[in-house]
Amino acid sequence: MAAAAAGGAPGPAPGPSRPAPAARNPPAVPRRRGDSRRRQAALFFLNNISLDGRPPSLGPGGEKPAPPPPPPTEAREAPAPPPAPPGGLPGLPARPAPQGLLSPTTAPAGLGLDGQRQRRRVTSQRCSLEFLEDTVGCASVQRTKHASGSPRHKGLKKTHFIKNMRQYDTKNSRIVLICAKRSLCAAFSVLPYGEGLRISDLRVDSQKQRHPSGGVSVSSEMVFELEGVELGADGKVVSYAKFLYPTNALVIHKNDSHGLLPQPRPSIPRAPPGSRHKPVPTKSTPAGTELGSDGGDAVEYNPNLLDDPQWPCGKHKRVLIFASYMTTVIEYVKPADLKKDMNETFREKFPHIKLTLSKIRSLKREMRNLSEECSLEPVTVSMAYVYFEKLVLQGKLNKQNRKLCAGACVLLAAKISSDLRKSEVKQLIDKLEERFRFNRKDLIGFEFTVLVALELALYLPENQVLPHYRRLTQQF
């Protein structure tokens, strides 16, 4: 017994030392099992993705897809070791089960085929997943573009690589300059210039007729032209040299054989030294001798004519003259009758003016209110009044172009008398567009027309500006 105990003592000693590696292996088993479950869930999720629009619960034939087979990695996993018998007898057959992992059997061949199939399936699923992600990404980008309001491009325009531009018609197309290696140098578009292609002309029938005055239809000739003002349209060259006169006294004009040079306008009033305003010559020549003159030009401008306080009285006043003083008695009359009487009296005295006196004063009030909103100085408003009244007295205004003329006069006066920045000019144009309800493109195009109608005389003498300035300062 002692020998058996002594001889059997070494028997169980290697037993506890052998399962030492086996004791380290079991922690890897749950990890591989968890990986297989994750892979199985991923494959099941990818299989349920429908690329043809069918619901994921139905297959191609309308049948439910079979559940995925169990992963082959589970066959490789070692079963849980049985509990050790009591007493630790070595004669129990406890080793054949783990021996199957190391013994060469037919299972590895089947497992290799299943592994290859699984790899192919995973590869195909990855490819399909990448394709799906690309498709969804493109769709999302398109949805965001269309949701933002940008129009869909039906098709790209054809691109031509040309060397001679005379062989191709580049109308309504974009021209791109490239190098020999086809790298971009510059891209630009050519916009044609002409009276027939003006955007404002196309908008006359659509936008301008929404707010007509007096039920009068708006035409392009009335809106964009002033009566008696000739512009260089349809390729015609028009010279405005007749509106210029020499200011340098050292220049000596010599007569040549072709004819006499035009003499400077006589009796030119000079502005005092240090003044910014350019003097305007008086009209001493008879009407018709100068180019571009009409019936309204022969009368010298009077800044107190349209602002005479006697106009609102009309025929409803009675003048009483006494020995030492004179007084006026005005009877009570309805405002509508007084306004009608005033306009009739004004039309009788100035038959060539197409606007009523009440409408002229209403436009001047709009100009003053606009100048207050834009913080313009009273001298700027006074100059705008002078420009506007000159056009009125010349008979160049009508019901269609009166607002454009008023806006252009304010814009010219602000540019010539104030040191405005770009942002301030933009703000002024926005205010003009909002108050007078016209398009800014029409205003900018009409600005030069008003400048020609004023004979390029934007610098005014003080005797024309000061009366308006005094009245404005009293009102402010």
UniProtKB/Swiss-Prot annotation:
Report the transmembrane regions from the record.
none
What is known about the tissue distribution of this protein?
Widely expressed.
- Regions of compositional bias (Pro residues) in chain numbering: 65-96, 263-272
Which UniProt keywords are given for this protein, alphabetically ordered?
Cell cycle, Cell division, Cyclin, Phosphoprotein
For the biological process aspect of GO, one term held by this record is: regulation of cell cycle
One Pfam family this sequence matches: Cyclin_N
Stretches of Basic residues bias are at 30-40
Residues covered by region (Disordered): 1-119, 256-295
Sites of Phosphoserine modification: S128, S206
* Entry similarity comment: Belongs to the cyclin family.
Subunit composition and interactions:
Binds to CDK3, CDK5 and ABL1. The C-terminal cyclin-box-like region binds to CDK5.
Q: What does this protein do?
A: Unknown. Probably involved in G1-S cell cycle transition.
What name appears for this protein in its UniProt entry? CDK5 and ABL1 enzyme substrate 2
Q: Which organism is it from?
A: Mus musculus
